Structures are given as C-alpha cells and as structure tokens.
Amino acid sequence: MPAPRFKSGSFKKISKRGPGNKTLTHHRRSKVSKAKCGACGALLNGVPRGRKIEIAKLSKTEKRPERPYGGFLCPKCLKRLMIEKARNL
C-alpha cells in the first residue's frame, strides 16, 4: 500500500529497479503546466514554471513581467487591448 500522501493525482509513479532486481515504485510530483495567455492561449515568456510553494520563494520581479497585464496576456494581445481602449476614449 502506498502512503496516504502518495495517493494524490499530483504524484507521478516511476518504476525503478532495486536490489535483487525488484521493481520499486517511486513517486515524483508532476510538473506544472506552462502559463498561457488568457485571450489567445499562447505560451507566456518570462513566467516561471513551478508549484505555488516554489514561486512564493521568488522575488516579485522574477514572478512575472513588469508591465500591465504581465503574466496574464501575451504582448500581442496586450497591444491589441491598449489600442482598443485608446480608440474607445
């Protein structure tokens, strides 16, 4: 039986060969998916890929780009949004 903490779906099961040619099951946390743009779904640059506890240890400037909607919209969608807002004034 696996330990209760390993029953979560956030752990990947990896088979390893141990002493005496035994098959062992190691558990490793699965990777977090890459950040995507909220409008078009493109991958975002400058946004770290990691679990919340790992990202919490980073400084503010390492967590996301320092521009409006940084970490939520890609530069192309941001440009479109700014133009749209300027035209609606």
UniProtKB/Swiss-Prot annotation:
Transmembrane segments: none annotated. The keyword Ribosomal protein applies. The keyword Ribosomal protein applies. GO terms for cellular component: ribonucleoprotein complex; ribosome. It comes from the Archaea. GO terms for biological process: translation. Residues 1-32 are annotated as: Disordered. GO terms for molecular function: structural constituent of ribosome. Keywords: Ribonucleoprotein, Ribosomal protein. Belongs to the eukaryotic ribosomal protein eL34 family. This is Large ribosomal subunit protein eL34. The gene is rpl34e.
